């Protein structure tokens, strides 16, 4: 599957406002989302599995890749396209042994050293951040800004997406770095019109 990282949605059910996750994801895809990561913290394995399976029904229908945050077991159970791992999650080499060469493995990085290490270890793509202050993620170690993003982007050759505080007012500045895509949560999920919110984040709409 050819991966288009242009508009990368990360799910967060705290923003649903009573809406169904499946419907929200579908509207986001119809608005232009090209890849979806299911991210669930502090839930049981059973609940995570059920949520991921539900989202996969939508992504499969629209032929959009689905990535699972952190949990290799969930990724395997639903046959997701891959996983996204943080710096404190399972080592990439071990994840690759478990998932095989055909699955996508993305790694979160915040500096050039982490980026080069992930690339050298065989990451398929990188999530670079945090770019701007954000309310979605509380344990932000360092805001790297556009300059930090550019330095990391210039040091690597694999695809990457920027994450952290990206919205319709600043995403064009982020894309000027040459990055393959932007990763968002609240910029889409916290809006009333999900489809329009996604569409507003496309450079060539």
Swiss-Prot record:
Role noted for this protein: Condenses 4-methyl-5-(beta-hydroxyethyl)thiazole monophosphate (THZ-P) and 2-methyl-4-amino-5-hydroxymethyl pyrimidine pyrophosphate (HMP-PP) to form thiamine monophosphate (TMP).
Swiss-Prot/TrEMBL GO biological process terms: thiamine biosynthetic process; thiamine diphosphate biosynthetic process
Chain sites annotated for binding 2-[(2R,5Z)-2-carboxy-4-methylthiazol-5(2H)-ylidene]ethyl phosphate: 134-136, 165, 185-186
Ligase among keywords: no
Protein's recorded name: Thiamine-phosphate synthase
Pathway(s) annotated for this protein in UniProt: Cofactor biosynthesis; thiamine diphosphate biosynthesis; thiamine phosphate from 4-amino-2-methyl-5-diphosphomethylpyrimidine and 4-methyl-5-(2-phosphoethyl)-thiazole: step 1/1
Its EC number(s): 2.5.1.3
Organism for this UniProt entry: Clostridium botulinum (strain 657 / Type Ba4)
UniProt-recorded Gene Ontology molecular function terms: magnesium ion binding; thiamine-phosphate diphosphorylase activity
Source organism phylogeny: Bacteria, Bacillati, Bacillota, Clostridia, Eubacteriales
Cofactor(s) demanded: Mg(2+)
HAMAP family noted in UniProt: TMP_synthase (MF_00097)
